């Protein structure tokens, strides 16, 4: 009888232990050539295109006029005088631009007329544009190696932190498993000891005492493991945040030097083929962004409308949607097919710091995965600058 009772208690303990176990995210020549009115016709494979009207005279249809205005604004803000002259005085460069922008002949002709006028204005406004461009190039060639070295060091340290977090987390996980095992063993021995007490006249207390000791050891192991994990995470957060701040400060050095004259830095692009097609693809992005906006049902009805003149020479008014900037809408378009050289530095540097907001957010995370993402993001920014440094260096050696 006692044997059967002992067997039932043992089965009960094993069943309870099993129950606990089971519950457990990227032309320096030619101001004069522009003055000579270089031929503006460009064959884009669209011979049936009809004239749009004269943009400067305000006789163009409203939608095409708005596109020309957006394109002129883009060239004013994002393209250097040197590169604009190159585009307008080299027919091959212009044809490459038009092809990349996917412009029909009528729009290409009107855009070129508007750009001829813009080039004259830019030359008259800034006679020292060549000297400024050279100044920016010299600064970048001198300072970038230092910035690169410091950024690479920060990236290595971030990855080391991520590896450290993984190791500590793995260690504390093992400790927690050991703690759990000890706790289970403690529970079994304690239950067995208590269950056998009525049948062994106190002899089962021999099992009860080690069970309680194992329980205390399990509790201490769990507390120590959790404390180690929390301490490591807190320390890692502080270190990662410091590294990200230092890295962003390095990126800011580039932006602060360029200041309001960021467009002149575009002259660092040494590859005419890539330059002209890159600008063309950005203009294509402007057209697509506008087309997408117009294709949204009731989009125009959901925004207030304002009336503006098409041009300074014309009193004609057109109704225009008070909409988000097309430049802002197209900023997220990546020129991935221009890789591996990211010549369009202005798109990658002007907003380099501001687009890095999530680097701060990543630095607040204690996980190894997030730290690795932060390191990867910094490395991508560094690669953009490094590609441009190589272009400048090769151009200087010619």
Swiss-Prot record:
Example of a GO biological process term: cytolysis by host of symbiont cells
InterPro entries recorded: ApoL
PANTHER family the UniProt entry points to: APOLIPOPROTEIN L, APOLIPOPROTEIN L1
Signal peptide: 1-27
Designated name of the protein: Apolipoprotein L1
Record's keyword annotation contains Cell inner membrane: no
Function: May play a role in lipid exchange and transport throughout the body. May participate in reverse cholesterol transport from peripheral cells to the liver.
Modified residues (Phosphoserine): 311, 314
Gene Ontology MF terms in the entry: chloride channel activity; lipid binding
Tissue expression summary: Plasma. Found on APOA-I-containing high density lipoprotein (HDL3). Expressed in pancreas, lung, prostate, liver, placenta and spleen.
């Amino acid at each position: 009888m006692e044997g059967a009772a002992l067997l039932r208690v043992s089965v009960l303990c094993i069943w309870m232990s099993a129950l606990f176990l089971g519950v457990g995210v990227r032309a320096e020549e030619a101001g004069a050539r522009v003055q000579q009115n270089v031929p503006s016709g460009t064959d884009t494979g669209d011979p049936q295109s009809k004239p749009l009207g004269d943009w400067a005279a305000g006789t163009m249809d409203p939608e095409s006029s708005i596109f020309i205005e957006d394109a002129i604004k883009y060239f004013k803000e994002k393209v250097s005088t040197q590169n604009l002259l190159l585009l307008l005085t080299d027919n091959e460069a212009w044809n490459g631009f038009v092809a990349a922008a996917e412009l029909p002949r009528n729009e290409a002709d009107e855009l070129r007329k508007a750009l001829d006028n813009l080039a004259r204005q830019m030359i008259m406004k800034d006679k020292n544009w060549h000297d400024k461009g050279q100044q920016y190039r010299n600064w970048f060639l001198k300072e970038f190696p230092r910035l690169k070295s410091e950024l690479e060091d920060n990236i290595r340290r971030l990855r080391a932190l991520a590896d450290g977090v993984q190791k500590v987390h793995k260690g504390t996980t093992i400790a927690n498993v050991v703690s759990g095992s000890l706790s289970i063993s403690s529970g079994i021995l304690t239950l067995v000891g208590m269950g056998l007490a009525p049948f062994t006249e106190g002899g089962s207390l021999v099992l009860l005492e080690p069970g309680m000791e194992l329980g205390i050891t399990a509790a201490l192991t769990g507390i120590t493991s959790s404390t180690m994990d929390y301490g490591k995470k807190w320390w890692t957060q502080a270190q990662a945040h410091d590294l990200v701040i230092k890295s962003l400060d390095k990126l800011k050095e580039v932006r602060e030097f360029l200041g309001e004259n960021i467009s002149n830095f575009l002259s660092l692009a040494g590859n005419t083929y890539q330059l002209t097609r890159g600008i063309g693809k950005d203009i294509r992005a402007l057209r697509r962004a506008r087309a997408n906006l117009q294709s949204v049902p009731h989009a125009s009805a959901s925004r207030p409308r304002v009336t503006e003149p098409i041009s300074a020479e014309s009193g004609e008014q057109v109704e225009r949607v008070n909409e988000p900037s097309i430049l802002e809408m197209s900023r997220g378009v990546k020129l991935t097919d221009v890789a591996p050289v990211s010549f369009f530095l202005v798109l990658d540097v002007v907003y380099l710091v501001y687009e890095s907001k999530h680097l701060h957010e990543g630095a607040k995370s204690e996980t190894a995965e997030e730290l690795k993402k932060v390191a990867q993001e910094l490395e991508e920014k560094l690669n953009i600058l490094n590609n441009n440094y190589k272009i400048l260096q090769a151009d200087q050696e010619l």
